[in-house]
Amino acid sequence: MRLIVVSGHSGAGKSVALRVLEDLGYYCVDNLPVNLLDAFVQSVSESKQNVAVSIDIRNIPKKLKELNTTLEKLKAELDVTVLFLDANKETLLTRYSETRRIHPLSLDSQSLSLDQAIELEQEILMPLKAHADLVLNSSGQSLHDLSETVRMRVEGRERKDLVMVFESFGFKYGLPSDADYVFDVRFLPNPHWEPALRPLTGLDGPIGAFLEQHQSVLDLKYQIESFIETWLPLLEKNNRSYLTVAIGCTGGKHRSVYLTQKIGEFFADKGHQVQIRHTSLEKNVKE
């Protein structure tokens, strides 16, 4: 039996993750109190069915040590994965504004504003996030994108495959929090300064044609691919479930998008499990 414990920030997508796991054949339980986790697992262990449980901030003990002790005990007996759903404050504020729901911590203390509740929850959950096996950042992702991310990561972990995630971003929006490697490509020639190219993105042919005229772009693409290829065997031997490579330019529209797409396709063509995301483009589409 395999157990996935789903936790994370309220509004970051725990319910979405649980629905995906249910579709993958997991027996799912929402908002299970931590003190019942061990007994629940023992009660279903003979069924041999994979199980997923979500733990809400209100069900986490005040002393996280109690939760860690329970998880360590279960890990000694079962194949246990802790999946943590993360999102930045801007995304969480937007989601709560759209759904008009009340944050769980605000229910317990009506003196807390939404902003304060989010910050308090981040502080409480920090140790749990640090010990999670999978951390997924849902900032700016649609329900479909998040569902696909969860599915790929979980299925990849079940097959013991390394899932390679390539994401482009804009430095003006901040660094991605889930990246293992970050490449800054702001020194490359910028199509933004060509009026005819400015409205396009790195996914468009004319942008690719412009960038491929410059040897520096081709050299950097080759060097990033070579760097990852060199160390990939050791990363796979280290029992990693996923590798996230972030490539950033100023706005996340042209240079980083082009390189992320091409490098992701390079590794996909070699048979690796690859997911490609363009975070700033997704953000701009929503805006």
Curated annotation (Swiss-Prot):
Positions that bind ATP: G8, H9, S10, G11, A12, G13, K14, S15
Superkingdom assignment? Bacteria
The molecular function GO annotations come to:
ATP binding; GTP binding
Which keywords does this Swiss-Prot/TrEMBL entry list?
ATP-binding, GTP-binding, Nucleotide-binding
In this chain, GTP is annotated as bound at D56, I57, R58, N59
Q: Does the keyword GTP-binding apply?
A: yes
What family is it from?
Belongs to the RapZ-like family.
What is the name listed in the Swiss-Prot or TrEMBL entry for this protein? Nucleotide-binding protein VIBHAR_03667
SUPFAM superfamilies per record: P-loop containing nucleoside triphosphate hydrolases
**Job description of the protein:** Displays ATPase and GTPase activities.
Q: Is Nucleotide-binding among this UniProt entry's keywords?
A: yes
Query: Matching InterPro entries, A to Z?
Result: P-loop_NTPase, RapZ-like, RapZ-like_N, RapZ_C
